[in-house]
Amino acid sequence: MFYSIVAIFVGAGLGALLRWFLSLALNEFFPAVPLGTLAANLIGGYVIGIAAVVFTTRVGLPPEWRLFVITGFLGGLTTFSTYSVEVMTHAVQGEFGWAFAVAALHLTGSFALTALGMWTARAWLAAA
């Protein structure tokens, strides 16, 4: 149990720091679509795709790695709540086009990158 807690704790901290750095570096460039939040969710989509394949095909990996990557790192990196408030802020201000655009970018981008991550992992594993 101790190693599971440490894996989640360290992963979440690293994921949250990366999300914060992405926001600092990217959000100022296009305020209508905060690119830091978008980047965090798209990176998370790609990594979860890889992780889903790796952790289902490499069953011998210690469970702490899954907790570190998925529960910890990706839990700290990706953000549904920030995405939600960014979409709703546009909607409340009557900017329905922007609200739809932000929602569509996050959803379609995350699904596409999750699929790409799964494809990437399968290709890597097949080549190994």
Swiss-Prot record:
Keywords: Cell inner membrane, Cell membrane, Ion channel, Ion transport, Membrane, Metal-binding, Sodium, Transmembrane, Transmembrane helix, Transport. The chain crosses the membrane at residues 5-25, 35-55, 67-87, 96-116. Its main location: membrane. It comes from the Bacteria. It is found in: Cell inner membrane. It holds the Pfam family CRCB. One of its GO terms (molecular function) is fluoride channel activity. InterPro entries: FluC. Na(+) binds at G75, T78. It catalyses: fluoride(in) = fluoride(out). It is a multi-pass membrane protein. Coiled coil: none annotated. One of its GO terms (cellular component) is plasma membrane. One of its GO terms (biological process) is cellular detoxification of fluoride. Na(+) is not transported, but it plays an essential structural role and its presence is essential for fluoride channel function. PANTHER family: FLUORIDE EXPORT PROTEIN 1-RELATED. Belongs to the fluoride channel Fluc/FEX (TC 1.A.43) family. Fluoride-specific ion channel. Important for reducing fluoride concentration in the cell, thus reducing its toxicity. This is Fluoride-specific ion channel FluC. It comes from Burkholderia lata (strain ATCC 17760 / DSM 23089 / LMG 22485 / NCIMB 9086 / R18194 / 383).
